[in-house]
């Protein structure tokens, strides 16, 4: 039995295919979803989406949004999403270093909050590449 997973951003469909299982980062922690999961709607945190296709796991970096699960269908609407295979490792590492430097230089509450958010996004992209599946 499978689940239909659809990952959408405001600009494109990132994923629309059947999967065996997912592990989703929510604002209250990670949840695993298998076929016949109870219906829920949840906020999606900045984090990794793990997708199981048969015996293979794939990862995707999600940049926050929400998900609806029910009737073996999962719809994930996020601000942005990238498959790990589409992320350039060198560019992701550079972005992480820039975000870390920006946080060190941040002055004031607003700059610190924005720098922390940029750092979380950058770390998520690096984690998506390095995820052990």
From Swiss-Prot:
Main subcellular location: plastid
Subcellular location field: Plastid, Chloroplast thylakoid membrane
Keyword terms of this UniProt record: ATP synthesis, CF(1), Chloroplast, Hydrogen ion transport, Ion transport, Membrane, Plastid, Thylakoid, Transport
Purpose: Produces ATP from ADP in the presence of a proton gradient across the membrane.
CDD domains per UniProt: F1-ATPase_delta (cd12152)
Similarity comment: Belongs to the ATPase epsilon chain family.
Molecular function terms, GO-annotated: ATP binding; proton-transporting ATP synthase activity, rotational mechanism
InterPro entries per UniProt: ATP_synth_F1_dsu/esu, ATP_synth_F1_dsu/esu_N, ATP_synth_F1_esu_C, ATPsynth_dsu/esu_N
Source superkingdom: Eukaryota
Membrane association type: Peripheral membrane protein
Name the record gives this protein: ATP synthase epsilon chain, chloroplastic
Subunit description: F-type ATPases have 2 components, CF(1) - the catalytic core - and CF(0) - the membrane proton channel. CF(1) has five subunits: alpha(3), beta(3), gamma(1), delta(1), epsilon(1). CF(0) has three main subunits: a, b and c.
Biological source species: Helianthus annuus
Gene3D superfamilies in alphabetical order: 6.10.140.480, F0F1 ATP synthase delta/epsilon subunit, N-terminal
PANTHER family: ATP SYNTHASE DELTA/EPSILON CHAIN, ATP SYNTHASE EPSILON CHAIN, CHLOROPLASTIC
């Amino acid at each position: 039995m499978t689940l239909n997973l659809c990952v959408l951003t405001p600009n494109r469909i990132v994923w629309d295919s059947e999967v065996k299982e997912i592990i989703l980062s929510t604002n209250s922690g990670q949840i695993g979803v298998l076929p016949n999961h109870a219906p829920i709607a949840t906020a999606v945190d900045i984090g990794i989406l793990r997708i199981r296709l048969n015996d293979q796991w794939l990862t995707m970096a999600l940049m926050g949004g929400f998900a609806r699960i029910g009737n073996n269908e999962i719809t994930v609407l996020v601000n942005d999403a990238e498959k790990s295979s589409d992320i350039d490792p060198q560019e992701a590492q550079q972005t992480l270093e820039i975000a870390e430097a920006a946080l060190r230089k941040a002055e004031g509450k607003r700059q610190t909050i924005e720098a922390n958010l940029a750092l979380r996004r950058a770390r998520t992209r690096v984690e998506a590449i390095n995820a052990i599946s």
